[in-house]
Regions:
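Non-catalytic terminal accessory segments
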Residues: 1-136
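N-terminal signal-anchor transmembrane helix
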Residues: 75-81, 103-181, 200-201
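Soluble catalytic domains of enzymes that build or remodel membrane lipids, polysaccharides, and related
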Residues: 147-378
Length: 378
């Protein structure tokens, strides 16, 4: 599909062909909405999990430019290999795109076979991934807390990304799932990215939450920062039953502290706020921190007497290969991708894969999850 990139075409022709090829293959043969630049942009996410840097995207762009104008095939193959890996990691049709490129450039299967492989594999995988995204499940977690009086049940929602591919009907689905639980819920937390992009989300989107009678605590994520945050928060506080915890602490039922920290890039500032809030209350109750971005290296958090950290943002790695990292290397890597982690027997970190995504509503072998957390106390 991208073999034309290896030729010395004029820039305008490359752009025209890129648009044409990706329009045909992405919109015509598949049922997801991806573009070349989206994949390049998302490529940084995988490496960002480990290095917290976007330099890897720059490397990919450099490789692409060199491959366009160099006669040495090693650069072409490096770019194609890089592109295949990135595409496979980050979009459901990425595997199909990568397979097509690999066949066309390296294996050189006949074009008609490539086309059939792409149609069957790409469309089939797309259907599976869209189905997965539209059928969220509960991820049940059970933990113990000796300092807690009685038991607690918490529902953890994250990364709804309303306003893009998700609307009121998505909220209705999540709310109905919660209401149909055969257990009493003490409170719900939403750990950021309630909205997606700069599309306005109105009160109507959030109205189904009013059916939930227990408290719903909410903090912002990085996508609220990208949009009309001030107006959205004002609407949340005035017209919905969501309780915004903007860098605040509430004592729930005189049994546990809930610390809400809105999204911030500066970890030092976040640490300072956590320490200030805990010291200010100083009631010796267990502390639950709700925060959007996972604490990638829990060692960076001093001993704040935390019991549990709830977060999202990573979408479970978004697709299948990343989930293997957790199972095979999760105890050696400090990176938190999905699920429950125990940090040095001091506190728990639960990273929920969430129910939405930014962009096409699809997930590659990573379930859309709502956290259901049972805490057993004394």
């Amino acid at each position: 599909m991208l073999s034309f990139l290896a030729k010395k075409n004029p820039i305008y022709l490359i752009i025209i062909k890129s648009i044409f090829y990706f329009f045909i293959f992405e919109f015509g043969l598949s049922i997801t909405i991806n573009t070349y630049l989206v994949i390049l942009t998302y490529s940084s996410r995988f490496f960002n999990l480990f290095y917290q840097t976007f330099y890897i995207t720059l490397i990919l762009y450099i490789l692409m430019i060199i491959s366009l104008y160099s006669s040495k095939k090693i650069f072409h193959y490096l770019f194609y290999l890089f592109f295949v890996l990135i595409a496979w990691f980050y979009h459901n049709t990425g595997g199909a795109i990568g397979l097509y490129i690999l066949n066309k450039v390296i294996i050189e299967l006949p074009s008609i076979i490539n086309l059939l492989i792409y149609i069957i594999f790409g469309t089939g995988l797309s259907i599976l991934c869209i189905y997965t995204d539209n059928n969220p499940k509960f991820d049940t977690i059970k933990i113990k807390c000796e300092k807690l009086k009685g038991n607690l049940t918490i529902v953890h929602l994250t990364d709804l990304h309303l306003g893009g591919a998700y609307g009121r009907e998505s909220v209705e689905l999540y709310v109905n799932m919660i209401l149909n639980l055969k257990t009493n819920i003490d409170f719900v937390v939403i750990t950021g990215d309630l909205v997606d992009g700069n599309i306005q989300v109105t009160k109507d989107f959030l109205e189904p939450f009013s059916l939930i009678k227990c408290p719903i605590y909410y903090i912002t994520g990085n996508h609220e920062e990208l949009t009309w945050k001030k107006e959205f928060i004002e609407m949340i506080e005035k017209e919905t039953n969501l309780i915004h915890l903007p860098n605040n602490l509430v004592v729930f039922d005189k049994r546990i502290n809930i610390i809400g920290i809105d999204y911030k890039k500066n970890l030092d500032e976040t640490r300072g706020q956590i320490k200030y809030l805990i010291n200010k209350e100083n009631n010796n109750l267990p502390n639950i921190l709700i925060h959007h971005v996972p604490i990638f290296k829990p060692d960076t958090l001093p001993d704040f007497n935390l019991f549990l950290v709830l977060c999202g943002h990573i979408h479970g790695g978004k697709c299948f290969p990343l989930t293997l990292i957790k199972f095979f290397f999760g105890r050696w890597l400090t990176t938190i991708i999905e699920g429950l982690y125990i940090h040095k027997d001091k506190f728990f970190v639960y990273c929920c894969s969430g129910v939405g995504t930014s962009g096409p509503n699809s997930r590659c072998f990573v379930g859309a999850n709502i956290g259901l957390i049972y805490i057993e106390g004394n």
